[in-house]
Amino acid sequence: MLVFIDDGSTNIKLQWQESDGTIKQHISPNSFKREWAVSFGDKKVFNYTLNGEQYSFDPISPDAVVTTNIAWQYSDVNVVAVHHALLTSGLPVSEVDIVCTLPLTEYYDRNNQPNTENIERKKANFRKKITLNGGDTFTIKDVKVMPESIPAGYEVLQELDELDSLLIIDLGGTTLDISQVMGKLSGISKIYGDSSLGVSLVTSAVKDALSLARTKGSSYLADDIIIHRKDNNYLKQRINDENKISIVTEAMNEALRKLEQRVLNTLNEFSGYTHVMVIGGGAELICDAVKKHTQIRDERFFKTNNSQYDLVNGMYLIGN
């Protein structure tokens, strides 16, 4: 079984093909604490051990391990998150080959060539032995690595002339990856990566504001509040101190403005593109501003309804 994995810092996205040809996708959030969860009743608990450390999935714990940093790519918790995604995907536990990702700043060196040291480091990370208390884990046999951003434009690029180019803007939890790719995937004109700019800029601001509203929680909770930021009933349900909701929304909106402006400033480094595509978990937050800033007409601007799956779908189309 070959499984394509976009192992982003906020969520793990999987895509694979069943034996009957059906294409399946699965998403699993990254929210793990360094201790085992308490078992109760029939509810399945995922308690892992890796390198002598205990981990468990916990979507609400404020003590969840921070994954929005570049070190995440080679960390133990990355391995835990990928195995957890596999175990919750519905796939039978077995041996699998995987294709995973690295941000552009990690996949390429300063000369825009594949960074073999980082790529091998990423592969080696998945050779670590992990155990599941009371259960079996997948055995990862072969590991291949693709760069982020670029594969997401595969379908669009096949339809473009070789003199056209697609600007692919991939805003994730930790990084902003931008690539300018020639039509038919005939070449890559320019790449850019910022490992310090991602949706985590907003997540951190929301978490800090939530603490003031007596709602200390995980990054997963903060991200869910960002997603439902326009739903007042949801905010009242999630935020303990109703009188402090405005503090949370003001902090969130200010962080969103900063994120948007930093992305737009980066886009000024690119020129000559004919089409634009916005992908990643942060696509919804910036797509309108990007479209206005680039002044690309409607039929040349691409933003799917499932932006989080764009990268893993492109990986699947290229590698399957």
Swiss-Prot record:
InterPro entries: ASKHA_NBD_ParM_R1-like, ATPase_NBD, ParM/StbA_N, ParM_C. One of its GO terms (biological process) is plasmid partitioning. Pfam families: ParM_N, StbA_N. Keywords: Plasmid, Plasmid partition. Signal peptide: none annotated. GO terms for molecular function: identical protein binding. Involved in the control of plasmid partition. Required for the accurate segregation of the plasmid. Belongs to the plasmid partition ParM family. Homopolymerizes into double helical protofilaments with a longitudinal repeat similar to filamentous actin. This is Plasmid segregation protein ParM. The gene is parM.
